Curated annotation (Swiss-Prot):
It comes from the Eukaryota. The keyword NAD does not apply. InterPro entries: Beta_defensin_dom (IPR025933). One of its GO terms (cellular component) is extracellular region. This is Beta-defensin 112. Has antibacterial activity. It is found in: Secreted.
């Protein structure tokens, strides 16, 4: 897996975590049945929509991801993938703040730090 793809994925997880007080979308997918079982015993039902989750982070549900995209998870069924476009490393909006690693500087995502 390319470094750029890995960093984009980490940025998406951080972005989602900051906008929600609960765990990341990927953790919810892994622990969904655990939460549903607990909720049912309390009389509440939790619905996890993979399609809505995919589109919430800018992904698209498709049968096959393009070369410029990477697959995060499947959508409604295992043959439909959540495809997210790779970030452009020359766009400053795609840079990650170094304060996430202890400083206040910015660096391009594809550089080694």
């Amino acid at each position: 897996m390319k470094l750029l793809t890995t960093i984009c994925r980490l940025k998406l997880e951080k972005m989602y975590s900051k906008t929600n007080t609960s765990s990341t979308i990927f953790e919810k997918a892994r622990h969904g049945t655990e939460k549903i079982s607990t909720a049912r015993s309390e009389g509440h039902h939790i619905t996890f929509s993979r399609w809505k989750s995919c589109t919430a982070i800018g992904g698209r549900c498709k049968n096959q991801c393009d070369d410029s995209e990477f697959r995060i998870s499947y959508c409604a069924r295992p043959t439909t993938h959540c495809c997210v476009t790779e970030c452009d490393p020359t766009d400053p909006n795609n840079w990650i703040p170094k304060d996430s690693v202890g400083t206040q500087e910015w660096y391009p995502k594809d550089s080694r730090h």
